[in-house]
């Protein structure tokens, strides 16, 4: 679609900076070609990922806007976090989408509103808005934020001057009393989405939405399970993009495509076919989430001769590992089930966060990882501080560990390559 249609009038109607957006698309397209299309022996079904990459700012945006115009969808609801329940948006015939936050943009403008020593992800979403180059932000009727880290919490105060904004209050402790608070917060969000979309959530609507998102999670779980094999049937780069796509693409289409990928990878496992030779050093990634087009670290690991076999992150297992209980019959029961499922996400914002350490070690064992690469974006205090606990858990489990602090720029690629190559040689 992107190659057959001129999308510039659509982007212009969204108030975007066309020249800068063209420059961004050119850079991301070049990056995608250099990183993804140069991989050897990719599964044929990853052609879906090429489709996503080609249409991410064009065909998908047109599809969403066309659905709104045709009355098939009510509102486009953007978010930056896996704690925002997409089931609620779908139950109101809305379209949930993840928003741009994976590259540096308009940094000079951003630093007129946010401190220079703010994490790259936060500066990125502010920059994409101020630079008018993200069609997901521009097409969103509502942006749902969440007070996870302090940086986001305060940045949303600025972002609310730019977009229609609603911020969820997420507890920072896992216990029975905070779960009660969180359930009430989820119900407040449901009321807000109902009001924005002009649709009343019924048991039938919510049950269908829960099932649809659970099916997406099941497909991602199925694909992830194949990565325990040696040789790995699919690269870490392609696996990362499947989850990144899950934030943006149409849910039924993505679910079908991921199931196709999983089926092909299952066949590859049976045949002993992989994207890297048997015995390639296997890496578990853990740490900060990676939004499109932040593929730098996975590319470096796999170009250095390793293979990423799992991601303990919000653009990895935390997104899909738990399902919502589908046994509820009333809206309240189902909203409680949604809240309970999302409350299991072990973000570094929680204290204490012992379950995350257990998850990391268990994933490393289940996926037969040879080492753990723990990553924090620069100035991300939460993941930087929690890295010490991750290192201790890895050491106690006898799993080699390295911690990396990086940002979205490419200037540190050489240094990171040297560190990654040295780490792979030691395991």
Predicted stretch roles:
Residues 2-3, 8-75, 187, 191-320, ...:
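A charged, amphipathic alpha-helical module
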Residues 128-192:
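Acidic/His-rich segments in extracytoplasmic proteins that coordinate ligands and/or metal ions
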Residues 76, 141-142, 371:
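Structural motif
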